[in-house]
């Protein structure tokens, strides 16, 4: 199913790059922002923006419930995590997908595998990489 509106669950340059790419392919974007990021470039570039809480990331950008709520509020049907802790959290992936929202990032299974370095090395060896 094609993405009709993308929520970018990150800030700064990575969010801006994703938004510029989305603009080129006509996908509207939603920015989320913490209190201290209200005037940031990624907020100004997005078609829509949603406040998600206080400055500490654990109280805003890493709060999956707030990201899901922002998707529902704006009609965003997909989330791009950018990079960082959210992009590496298999629990976040599962919660977002369980909410019926498309996750544009590594699958939860891959993240689980990569979290276990020994299993990851073995899997890479079996793939002859």
Language-model regions, residue ranges each:
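N-terminal beta-alpha lobe that positions the nucleotide/phosphoryl donor
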Residues: 1-126
């Amino acid at each position: 199913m094609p993405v009709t509106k993308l929520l970018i669950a990150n800030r700064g340059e990575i969010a801006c790059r994703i938004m510029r790419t989305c603009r080129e392919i006509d996908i509207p974007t939603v920015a989320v922002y913490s209190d201290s990021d209200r005037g940031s470039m990624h907020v100004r570039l997005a078609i829509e923006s949603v406040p998600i809480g206080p400055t500490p990331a654990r109280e805003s950008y890493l709060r999956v419930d707030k990201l899901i709520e922002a998707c529902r509020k704006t009609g965003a049907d997909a989330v791009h995590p950018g990079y960082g802790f959210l992009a590496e959290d298999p629990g976040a992936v599962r919660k977002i997908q369980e909410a019926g929202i498309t996750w544009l990032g590594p699958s939860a299974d891959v993240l689980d595998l990569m979290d276990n370095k020994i299993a990851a090395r073995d899997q890479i060896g079996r793939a002859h990489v």
